[in-house]
Amino acid sequence: MNTMTMMDAETRFRATRTAPPFVLQNNFIGRPRTIGQAVQAAVDVIEDEALKPLSTSATRPFTQSRAVLALLARCYAQQIYNATQAASVAAHDPDFPWLWWEALPDARALRRFRVENREAVHRCLEAALHFLVEQKISAGVLTKVDGPQIAKEAGRRIIMAAFADSMELDGE
């Protein structure tokens, strides 16, 4: 089923696919086959209490927080560090799980979420990077997974995102 969702305050819309909640959850058995599945598996194990909501006025604040957490982890894993670009990914991704009547997150909200939920973003980003390393091992590019190095790389990418956002704010 297709619905229309508002992309921003203007009159532009984006098409989105809606599905029952069980389809939006991890519906794979065993190892994740995509980076999206790897990130979603990491997001699913994070407790609601560990997340600060994106918006206190949201209808389902933890659903929003989980969607933004998955978005940021996937973007940082794919080396998209700028919050404005991440917001654009959310606006143009038909699979981004967002309630159609609520405004999509903007760059400011994504930056605030990253700061307030740094540990959760770090954990999900580590899972995404671990998945990417496993893919490289399967392709024969790498020979082993280095857990401490993945943790350092996740921290470095979060710092890169903060730096990219600060550079953008300096330019305004």
Language-model features: where?
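Charged, often Cys/His-bearing segments associated with DNA-binding zinc-finger transcription factors
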Residues: 1-42
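Short acidic (Asp/Glu) and glycine-rich catalytic loops that position anionic groups and cofactors
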Residues: 16-20, 48-52, 105
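Basic, short loop/linker segments at the boundary and entry of helix-turn-helix/winged-helix-like folds
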Residues: 28-73, 78
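Catalytic micro-motifs at enzyme active sites that drive phosphoryl/nucleotidyl and oxygen chemistry
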Residues: 96-102, 128
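Major-groove recognition helix of helix-turn-helix-like DNA-binding domains
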Residues: 100-116
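Polybasic low-complexity intrinsically disordered regions
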Residues: 115-172
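DNA-recognition alpha helix
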Residues: 85-98
